[in-house]
Each structure stands twice: as C-alpha cells, then as structure tokens.
Design a protein with these regions (language model features):
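Short juxtamembrane and helix-loop transition motifs at transmembrane-helix boundaries
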Residues: 110, 132-143, 166-171
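Cytosolic juxtamembrane C-terminal amphipathic helix followed by a basic/polar low-complexity tail immediately after
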Residues: 231-233
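Alpha-helix initiation/capping motif
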Residues: 54, 138-139, 199
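Membrane-embedded multi-pass helical conduit in multi-pass membrane proteins
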Residues: 148-229
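Non-transmembrane catalytic domains and loops of membrane-associated enzymes and transporters
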Residues: 1-135
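Loop-to-transmembrane boundary segments
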Residues: 3, 136-151
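Residue-level recognition of hydrophobic positions within alpha-helical transmembrane segments
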Residues: 21, 50, 75-76, 113, ...
Length: 233
C-alpha cells in the first residue's frame, strides 16, 4: 500500500442552497465514484484534506514532486492529484477507506465555487499525462473513468448539436425517440442517486448548474492550462 484516503463530508452544508448542492455532490463522489476506483485498489486522487502516504515512498518522490513543471512553468498547486499519480506510478496500491470520515468547509458563494472548480479542472487536465502513466498497467476501468471525465464537455456539446440537427434534418420523430431514451436514462440515474441519499433538490438543480456553469468552466480550464493564477480564495 502506497497511500490511502477516506470519505469527506461538508461542515457548512446548511448554510445555503449552494452548500447543500455541494454536500450532495460530495456524497455522490465519496459513496459511488471513489469506492468504484478503490475497488481496483487504484484511487485516482487522495483528497488533500484527508490522506495518508507511506513515508518510505515519499522520500524518493520528493525531488520529482517539488520540481514538477508544465509548459515550462513550475507547478505550485494541484499537489494532491500529482502526489497520488506519483504513488500510482510506483505500482503500489492506493486505497479508499469509506469508514474513515473527515469534514471540510466548502465555498458558500457561486464566485468562490467557480474559482475552486476552475483550479480543480486545470489540475485535472494538466495531470492527464501523469495520470495515464500511473494507471497504464492497471484495470481498464480506470482509463475509462479518466477518459469520460476528460471528454465530458465535448460529449455534452456534441450531444446537443446532434439532437438539434436530428430535429432539423431527419425529423422530429427520431428526436422524440432519442429524448424518450434520454429521459428513461435520467429516471434510472435519479432512482440510483435517491437510493444513495441524494435529495430531490439536488436532482432538479445540479443538472442545470453543471450544464450552464461547470461545463463552460471546464472548457475554459482546458483552454487556460498555462495560466499560473490558481488561488481559490
């Protein structure tokens, strides 16, 4: 075992609607997404607020960790993801322990939240070369997980364009069939999330928030990877 991380809760969840939405997003992340990665003993990111590392491994990784550069610029943030990638590259297990629980404060304003998401997404895209290097000999599910998250903005944009073009070029009957299938998939997803503790407000509001704000933030992060402005607060 090279490193491990646990579940993280939200201390200020009751503050407002945004913090409650983030709280439910955290529940989905630490009850569904992280356990799936942990099942293959290859957690893709040991969260900064709550992680442990094998000390004997760190001694050999510090030089690479402290001198990391991207596009000729020294990297000063995104440290939890890069350190996890370096551990994965050693071939050691990186475990997820759901029974170990910590709590953190999350952004309480939309401005702070979007700045946080911009920083996280820049880190995610910048780290892709190290992420794939760390998981190349591991279970294929991990590569699919990373690819799905990396391509999500393009896939969502392409889906919207295809739906619109189908209605104009092929006929509204085919578009209606596609929308029916999409609604059915959304219903199945909603049932799954509700079974895992998500609220109705999360299901109704997080989708528009993701499409309207977080997808553009992810695209902007991809276009501005070399921007050294990383501070969240």
């Amino acid at each position: 075992m090279g490193a491990a991380s646990g579940s993280i809760g939200v201390l200020n969840a009751p503050t407002n609607l945004l913090t409650r939405l983030i709280h439910h997003r955290y529940r989905l992340r630490f009850q569904v997404e992280r356990p799936a990665q942990g099942f293959f003993t290859s957690l893709l990111c040991c969260s900064g607020p709550f992680a442990v590392y094998r000390r004997s491994l760190l001694a050999g990784l510090w030089p690479r960790y402290l001198t990391q550069t991207f596009a000729g610029v020294r990297c000063t943030n995104g440290d939890d993801l890069h350190l996890t990638n370096l551990i994965l590259a050693t071939g050691r297990q990186v475990l997820f322990e759901p029974r170990a629980v910590a709590s953190t404060w999350v952004p309480r304003t939309l401005r702070l939240y979007l700045r946080q998401q911009l920083r996280w997404n820049r880190s995610f895209y910048r780290e892709l070369r190290w992420t794939f290097a760390g998981i190349r000999s591991r279970h294929p599910y991990l590569a699919l997980d990373v690819l799905a998250r990396a391509l999500l903005p393009l896939l969502l944009a392409a889906a919207l364009v295809l739906l619109a073009s189908e209605g104009l070029l092929v006929g509204w009957e085919l578009l209606a069939a596609d929308l029916t299938l999409a609604v059915a998939m959304l219903c199945l997803t909603a049932a799954f999330l509700l079974a895992h503790g998500a609220s109705v407000s999360f299901l109704l509001l997080y989708g528009p928030l993701h499409m309207g704000l977080l997808v553009p933030v992810r695209v902007w992060a991809l276009l501005t990877l070399a921007d050294p402005c990383w501070e969240t607060r």
